[in-house]
Amino acid sequence: MVDLVGGLVVHARAGERDLYRPLAGSKLVDSAEPVAVVEALLALHPFRALYLADLDAIRGRGDHRPLLVELTTRFPELTIWVDAGIASEDRLRDLAALPGVRPVLGSESQADPRLLERAHALASERLVLSLDWRGEEPLDPAGLRERPELWPRDVIVMTLARVGTASGPDFARLDAVHRAAGSARRVWAAGGVRGLEDLERLWERGIAGALVATALHDGRLGRTELARLAESVA
């Protein structure tokens, strides 16, 4: 996971976005510059996908599109999942047109379920849905969590209160979404991952994977742990 504010990678914690500060103290990289952070992540492990949250765009304070174009050019081996507060067809088309980008529709940004209905035609198999919660409160004005028939193949369960806190994934909510999603969809965890044991437990429950940042930067998920995980799920 890479969270962007004002052109820099920030340390996301508990969904309190106004309190996020540029990344510091990472064991991987001594910089908050996005290119340097991505290079450090790829030096740690040959990740094939990167989740990027444009927090400026999500909050209506500009966006990082030029940086996104740079990242797709510099790292063509990566598929970049981008949550940029997509709330219109034009914005969805713009992101879907970028090579290597998978647009993420965050439920917190959706006021009308019809965009998700139309998004399947606009982004096809690249579309990702993020079902967002803050604590027990769903951030879902359009009620997408109650419309599994509209969900695309990949669904993120984003528990913002757990992001950056090392408090563990919300296994109960993940289980519920996984049941609702059915066997044709993949469910991804976001928020709270502490280390290898959590990732193994998620895999055993049928969760496809997890979005992780803090555990990578503080060293709890290092090269050895990632290699073990890759071997066990191969």
Residue ranges and their predicted role:
Residues 1, 51-53, 81-85, 104-106, ...:
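A cross-family glycoside hydrolase active-site/sugar-binding cleft signature
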Residues 2-26, 90-166:
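Conserved anion-binding
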Residues 31-48:
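A short, N-terminal amphipathic alpha-helix
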Residues 49-63, 157-165:
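Glycine-rich, proline-tolerant flexible connector loops at the mouths of alpha/beta enzymes
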Residues 62-70, 139-146, 167-176, 227:
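Charged helix-capping and loop-helix junction motifs
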Residues 73-78, 125, 184-185, 228-233:
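Short acidic, glycine/proline-enriched helix-loop-strand junctions
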Residues 74, 79-103, 119, 144-150, ...:
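Catalytic cores of alpha/beta
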Residues 115-122, 200-234:
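C-terminal helical cap(s) of enzyme catalytic domains, especially alpha/beta-barrels
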